[in-house]
Structure formats: structure tokens, C-alpha cells
């Protein structure tokens, strides 16, 4: 006879462990346990049968996989947490006794930990890290725009700002921006980095009220991990592009305008140098202040981590060299038509969209958003703030500027008091819509004071309201009308075929008349049969939706209670979306009608 299994030694009871048991097993505090789980990417699990997993108890408990906790017990960072606990006790004891020198020695030998090995464990290849870089960027941009408080130190916000600016500098230098959307929450950007679509959100730089119900300890733990990850990613990206990491910083620009212009050294200088006369350009010393230099120990660690990460790559990537593309010249005998198309570094049309333009950005326009977009599309930027700064600090250089080279001026004001000849005046939305469409749009709709077209999300939901759908329908109708005209022209050429069709129709009519005569001979009227057929068709058309509703109800009966609730929620969302779409379409028709009436009145 087989032995009876003991209760709680197999199945859910063995596979899962409660959080209290996990903390007790690892011998750490709850806060350290949370930090460790965030670093290692371990999260709570939901067992199928909570009662069995909790050995008969029905109390609300958080569960983890027992294997995950066993995996955590071998983590080197766990040992550092224990060392820190011991260090804190010794430091507290020394301060309590008034032993300041001993406390200083202890502080100098404070135990420190690194997350490099965890990054390599969680992201074996570089592409894995790039695929998961969206959340780190969102978190870092959030903290970069936050003010320093008692919970978030000034050092944390400065570090986040430095990392985000380094990321934006790389994106602008390599011209990687593909989509932009300005929303209520902030500005959404999408870039194509090494073939991976990366999307992140940059909040607006408005005064923010820090909520009191947010646990910043958890967020700062995530920020610590994400900062380390972004350091790794930036180091690899800069090296692949043959750029120095960390990038150089211009202290004067950092003190003045700051932001992206101090990291991308060509951002403002490109625009200003383009305004100078060709024979009298200002020659500046190629001396700039280096940013925070990494220590030799940190550089060696990063190099070792990068080399070890490359060993785990599935596909070997060729070394990127900074070599100019070859220029192919056609032979002298060939004509201009036979000229060879030269290879371009930037394959995407968005990368060279504004390459022939110089934009003058007014002080009322957010420079950080437009600067990134314009530089990523190959354009040059001259800001009104930068020119004012140049006028104050270097009046001689300011006098040599040739402002006639500016092609576009971006303003966000309803009226312009004085216009400069040769400039195209536009509103900022023109930049975003051009990037999203990957083409230069007409500027007449974006002139100052004009009602702008709707700024739609480039990643919009297919089932949501699309104001441009009616325009597409109208264009399709126009195409159909053109096709009808073409068909009418073809009809004249196909008269013979039509004659044959008419003969066939006459034969059908003869058969129909013969059938009527047969029915009359049988004593049945043909009109009565036609009426019966019409009634049957009406009944069938009425019956069809009723049958569909009945079928839906039968399907609902077969659903479980959970599925039925989910179905109701789905239907509620669909109905709400349809109602909203109808309201917006009605609103649009009303606006267009009012606009048409105003146009008629203005013409009179």
C-alpha cells in the first residue's frame, strides 16, 4: 500500500512562499527585501489555489516563487545589505559614545555595492537592454524635471538631468527622432535606435506639486537601477558612433541657456555660424571643458562589463568605424541623366527633412522641444535668447551676423508687428506634423493667427475618431467619379457589346412574359407572387438582427460570471468610444457649417 502524502510538502504549498517567510529566510528588513526584488526583477505571484499555497489559511498574503527566493539568497548585494546593517549599528554606537574619530573612520569605510553584475544577468545582450529602455527613460525624465525636496535630493535630480541630456544629445547627433506628439501629459518622442523603436515621455517644465501619497523610496530604488542601466547603454551607443563618453560640456552655455545646447556643441553654433559671412566667420578655439571625468577604476569596470557583454551576444556585430562614404563619379562621356546617386549616411527621409533650413525660435516658444526636433531632422537653430546672450557678451560677433540667411521663424503669437522679408512665419505645430508625416507640409495652414489643424497622435487607435477620415472618403469619391467618367468614355467604344447584352435582356423579358402566361393559365396572379416575395424579404431582414441578438444572449448564458462581467466592461468601453466619436463628428460638422457661413458673410 502506497504511503499517504503529508500535507504541505508538494504542489502549491511547496512552490510558493509568503513574503513574511521570505524576509525571515533571507534575514533582511522588509525595505531591503523590496529593494533586492526590484534590482533582480522578482515580483509577487498569484497561485491558482491560495488556500493550498497558504497551508489552509485564507488570510490575504503576498506570495513569491520559492525558487526565486532561493535565487535571491545567493545574491552578493544581499551580503552588502547585511554589512550595511552592521555598519549602521557600529556608527550609531560610536556617535552615542561621542567617539567622533571612530565614527569618521567608519564613515570612510562605508560598505558600497554595485549593480553591474545584475545588469549583465538581466540583459545578456545589448538589444535586450535597448528593448527595455522605455521605462528607464520615462523615470529619469520625470526626476530630471522634479524640484529637489526633503525626500528627493538635489544630487538625484542633477544626475537624472545629466543622463537625460546625454541621451538627447546622442539622439539629436544621430538624427534618430521619427515621431513626436505633444499631449497634456508632456511630449512623446519615438526614436529608432539600432533598429529598435523606443518611445518615451518628457514632462513639460512647469512648476510641479509633489504628491504626498507617493512612496519615493520605491521610486528611488527603481531610479538607482535605471541610472546604472542607462549608463551602460549610453556608453555602448557613444562608442559605437565613435563619440567620447561622457560628452564634453560648454560651461558658458551651461550657465546661460543650458539643456541640450550645452551638450550638443553644434546646436547653437551651427545656426549662428550659418548666419556669418563666408569670408569672415568667427574662428573659435576648439577648447571646451570636459564633463565629469570617470575615474580609471570606473572606466576599467565599464570596459570589462562591455567586453563580457559582447561574449554573450548571439550575433557578432562588426566594429563601427568613422569612415566617410565613398563618392562615386560618373565617367565624362555620360550625360546628366546617368549621374550616379550618392550614398547617404541617413537613409530615413525624416533625418534630412530640415537640412536646408535655418529656424529662428522666438523666446515665447519652448526651445528644448523644438531644438531636439529640428536638430534631429538636420536643421539649424538660432534662438532669440541665444542672440540676446551673444549681443550682451560679444557685441562685435553679434554685429557680424547675417540674419538674411534665416528661412523660417517659429512664433507662438496671434499677430506679428514687423515681418522680415524672405522669412516664412510658422507656428510650432508645423514642425511636429512634418516629422510625423515625413514630408514638408504647406505652411499656409500654420501661419500665425490661423486655426491649426488637429494635432493627432501618430500611434492613434484604429477604432478612435479620425477627423481626416472624411477627407480620405471625399478623395476616394472623387477618384470614383473620375473612374465613372473614364467608363463613360469607354462606353462609346463598346457599343457592339451593349447591343449583345440588350438582346440577352430581351430574351429574359420573353421568358418572364411566358412565365406570367403560365401562372395566369393556372389561375394565379403574378403580382400576388411578387408581393409575397417582398413580404418574405422584409420578414427575413427584420428577423436577422433578432436572431443575432438571440445568439448573443445564448453566448452570454454559456459564459462564466467573470467572463460576463468582462464582456459588459468591454461593451461599455466600445459604446462610450462610439458615442464620443459621434459627438466629435457632430461638433466638426457644426464648426465647418459656422465657418462656411462666416466665409459667405466676409465675401459679401
UniProtKB/Swiss-Prot annotation:
A single cellular component GO annotation: PeBoW complex
Record localization: Nucleus, Nucleolus; Nucleus, Nucleoplasm
UniProt region (Disordered), positions on chain: 452-562, 579-604
Q: Which InterPro entries match?
A: BRCT_dom, BRCT_dom_sf, PES
User: Any idea where the BRCT domain is?
Assistant: 349-448
Q: Name one GO molecular function term.
A: large ribosomal subunit rRNA binding
Write out the entry's keywords from A to Z.
Coiled coil, Nucleus, Ribosome biogenesis, rRNA processing
GO biological process annotation, one example: maturation of LSU-rRNA from tricistronic rRNA transcript (SSU-rRNA, 5.8S rRNA, LSU-rRNA)
- Report the superkingdom from the record: Eukaryota
Q: Where is the composition biased (Acidic residues)?
A: 476-510
* Residue stretches of biased makeup (Basic and acidic residues): 593-604
Q: Which residues form a coiled coil?
A: 468-522, 573-604
Q: Which SUPFAM superfamilies match?
A: BRCT domain (SSF52113)
Q: Which family does it belong to?
A: Belongs to the pescadillo family.
**Assembly mode:** Component of the NOP7 complex, composed of ERB1, NOP7 and YTM1. The complex is held together by ERB1, which interacts with NOP7 via its N-terminal domain and with YTM1 via a high-affinity interaction between the seven-bladed beta-propeller domains of the 2 proteins. The NOP7 complex associates with the 66S pre-ribosome.
What is its biological role?
Answer: Component of the NOP7 complex, which is required for maturation of the 25S and 5.8S ribosomal RNAs and formation of the 60S ribosome.
What is the protein named? Pescadillo homolog
What organism is recorded for this protein? Scheffersomyces stipitis (strain ATCC 58785 / CBS 6054 / NBRC 10063 / NRRL Y-11545)
Amino acid at each position: 500500500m502506497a504511503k499517504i502524502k503529508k500535507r504541505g510538502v508538494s504542489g502549491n504549498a511547496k512552490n510558493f512562499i509568503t513574503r513574511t517567510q521570505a524576509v525571515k529566510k533571507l534575514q533582511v528588513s522588509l525595505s531591503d527585501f523590496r529593494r533586492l526584488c526590484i534590482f533582480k526583477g522578482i515580483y509577487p505571484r498569484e497561485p491558482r489555489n491560495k488556500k493550498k499555497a497558504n497551508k489552509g489559511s485564507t488570510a490575504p498574503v503576498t506570495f513569491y516563487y520559492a525558487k526565486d527566493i532561493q535565487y535571491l539568497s545567493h545574491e552578493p548585494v544581499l551580503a552588502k545589505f547585511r554589512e550595511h546593517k552592521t555598519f549602521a549599528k557600529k556608527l550609531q554606537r560610536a556617535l552615542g559614545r561621542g567617539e567622533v574619530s571612530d565614527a569618521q573612520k567608519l564613515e570612510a569605510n562605508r560598505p558600497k555595492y554595485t549593480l553591474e553584475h545584475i545588469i549583465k544577468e538581466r540583459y545578456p545582450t545589448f538589444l535586450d537592454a535597448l528593448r527595455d529602455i522605455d521605462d528607464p527613460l520615462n523615470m529619469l525624465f520625470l526626476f530630471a524635471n522634479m524640484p529637489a525636496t526633503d525626500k528627493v535630493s538635489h544630487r538625484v535630480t542633477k544626475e537624472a538631468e545629466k543622463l537625460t541630456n546625454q541621451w538627447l544629445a546622442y539622439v539629436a547627433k544621430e538624427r534618430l527622432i521619427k515621431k513626436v506628439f505633444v499631449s497634456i501629459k508632456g511630449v512623446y518622442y519615438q526614436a529608432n535606435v539600432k533598429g529598435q523603436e523606443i518611445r518615451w515621455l518628457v514632462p513639460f517644465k512647469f512648476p510641479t506639486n509633489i504628491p504626498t501619497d507617493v512612496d519615493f523610496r520605491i521610486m528611488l530604488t527603481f531610479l538607482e537601477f535605471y541610472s546604472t542601466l542607462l549608463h551602460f547603454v549610453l556608453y555602448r551607443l557613444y562608442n559605437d558612433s565613435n563619440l567620447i563618453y561622457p560628452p564634453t560640456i560648454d560651461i558658458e552655455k551651461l550657465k546661460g541657456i543650458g539643456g541640450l545646447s550645452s551638450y550638443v556643441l553644434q546646436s547653437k553654433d551651427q545656426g549662428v555660424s550659418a548666419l556669418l559671412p563666408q569670408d569672415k566667420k568667427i574662428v573659435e578655439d576648439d577648447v571646451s571643458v570636459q564633463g565629469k571625468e570617470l575615474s580609471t577604476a570606473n572606466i576599467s569596470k565599464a570596459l570589462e562589463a562591455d567586453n563580457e557583454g559582447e561574449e554573450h551576444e548571439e550575433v557578432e556585430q562588426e566594429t563601427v568605424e568613422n569612415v566617410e562614404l565613398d563618392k562615386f563619379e560618373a565617367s565624362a562621356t555620360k550625360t546628366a541623366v546617368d549621374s550616379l546617386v550618392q550614398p547617404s549616411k541617413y537613409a530615413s527621409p525624416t533625418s534630412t527633412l530640415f537640412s536646408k533650413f535655418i529656424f529662428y525660435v522666438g523666446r515665447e516658444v519652448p526651445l528644448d522641444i523644438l531644438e531636439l526636433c529640428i536638430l534631429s531632422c538636420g536643421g539649424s537653430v538660432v534662438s532669440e535668447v541665444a542672440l540676446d546672450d551673444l549681443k550682451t557678451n560679444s557685441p562685435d560677433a553679434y554685429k557680424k551676423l547675417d540674419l538674411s540667411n534665416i528661412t523660417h521663424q517659429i512664433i507662438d503669437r496671434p499677430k506679428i508687428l514687423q515681418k522680415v522679408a524672405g522669412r516664412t512665419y510658422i507656428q510650432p505645430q508645423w514642425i511636429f506634423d512634418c516629422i510625423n508625416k515625413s514630408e514638408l507640409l504647406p505652411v499656409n495652414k500654420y501661419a500665425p493667427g490661423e486655426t491649426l489643424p488637429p494635432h493627432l497622435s501618430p500611434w492613434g487607435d484604429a477604432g478612435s475618431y479620425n477627423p481626416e477620415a472624411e477627407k480620405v472618403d471625399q478623395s476616394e469619391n472623387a477618384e470614383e467619379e473620375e473612374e465613372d467618367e473614364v467608363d463613360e468614355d469607354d462606353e462609346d467604344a463598346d457599343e457592339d457589346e451593349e447591343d449583345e447584352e440588350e438582346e440577352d435582356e430581351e430574351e429574359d423579358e420573353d421568358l418572364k412574359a411566358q412565365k406570367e402566361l403560365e401562372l395566369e393559365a393556372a389561375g394565379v396572379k403574378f403580382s400576388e407572387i411578387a408581393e409575397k416575395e417582398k413580404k418574405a424579404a422584409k420578414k427575413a431582414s427584420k428577423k436577422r438582427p433578432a436572431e443575432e441578438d438571440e445568439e448573443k444572449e445564448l453566448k452570454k448564458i454559456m459564459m462564466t460570471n467573470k467572463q460576463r462581467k468582462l464582456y459588459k466592461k468591454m461593451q461599455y468601453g466600445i459604446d462610450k468610444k462610439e458615442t464620443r466619436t459621434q459627438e466629435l463628428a457632430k461638433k466638426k460638422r457644426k464648426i465647418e457649417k459656422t465657418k462656411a457661413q462666416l466665409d459667405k458673410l466676409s465675401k459679401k
